Regions:
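Short, flexible active-site loops
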Residues: 95-98, 121-124, 153
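Distinct, well-ordered alpha-helical segments
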Residues: 17-24, 43-51, 71, 100-118, ...
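Glycine-enriched alpha-helix->loop->beta-strand junction motifs that scaffold or abut catalytic
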Residues: 53-58, 78, 84-88, 119-123, ...
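H/E-rich (His + Asp/Glu) clusters that bind or coordinate divalent metals
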Residues: 124-126, 131-208
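Glycine-rich loops and low-complexity Gly/Arg-rich segments
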Residues: 33-36, 55-60, 83-86, 114-116, ...
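Short, surface-exposed connector motifs at secondary-structure boundaries
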Residues: 2-7, 27-31, 118-125, 182-184
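Active-site gating/metal-coordination segments in enzymes
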Residues: 6, 11-108
Length: 208
């Protein structure tokens, strides 16, 4: 209310049941995404339960934190449930964490999603943070797969660590002229409590 936010999305929350409890406190403002290991035997059932019984609205993964390729067939039942329930899938690719974090992993390249996105054209996949340093690959993925969108959230400080004179303004322009506004999801981002809403992320994007 302080910042005039109409809704807040939570994509991790210490387990699906715990996140559902948090969302239930302000169901008109809070939106939760399930977040659990996709390769487990019961992962598809857990996702269905999280959506149908707990009321969560999507599925979130951190690709560089997984111990198998994102396209591993073991996760296909999960993608099938995403298609069945018509829920969006938010998958973080690119560098992970702050300084000293993960800069290389078998799942760090957004193009790793190519085959999954092709196999499940009815699922909306979202790559956050403009691709988080993997700009070219994210654009190529979006070119090949019309069911892939991007979001703009985060500080996007990674632009200082890539080739080229990138700024948030230039990123907006590049994605606007390639994939179009309808596939760009505006977001701000934050992290663990008690940090709260990072208003400066909002102001940076409005300015640019």
């Amino acid at each position: 209310d302080k910042y005039g936010l109409r809704a807040v999305g939570f994509v991790t929350g210490g387990g699906n049941d715990n996140l559902a409890k948090i969302v239930s406190k302000y169901p008109d403002k809070f939106i939760g995404f399930a977040h659990h290991y996709p390769f487990a035997e019961g992962a598809a059932d857990e996702l269905r339960r999280s959506v149908k019984e707990l009321g969560l609205k999507g599925y979130k993964l951190l690709a560089p934190m997984l111990d198998r390729p994102i396209e591993d067939p073991a996760a296909y039942p999960v993608w099938e449930v995403c298609a069945e329930l018509d829920i969006p899938v938010l998958i973080h690719f690119g560098i992970q964490g702050g300084g000293g974090g993960i800069a290389w992993h078998e799942n760090i390249n957004p193009l790793k999603l190519h085959n999954v996105a092709k196999d499940f054209p009815d699922v909306t996949f979202v790559v956050p943070h403009f691709g988080c340093a993997w700009i070219r690959e994210t654009l190529q993925l979006c070119w090949a797969c019309g069911n892939v969108s991007i979001d703009t959230c985060g500080s996007n400080q990674w632009v200082r660590w890539v080739d080229g004179d990138w700024t948030t303004k230039k990123l907006f322009r590049k994605y606007m002229e390639t994939i179009g506004a309808e596939r760009i999801i505006f977001g701000t981002d934050s992290s663990y409590f008690p940090r709260g809403f990072a208003e400066r992320y909002l102001q940076d994007q409005i300015r640019d």
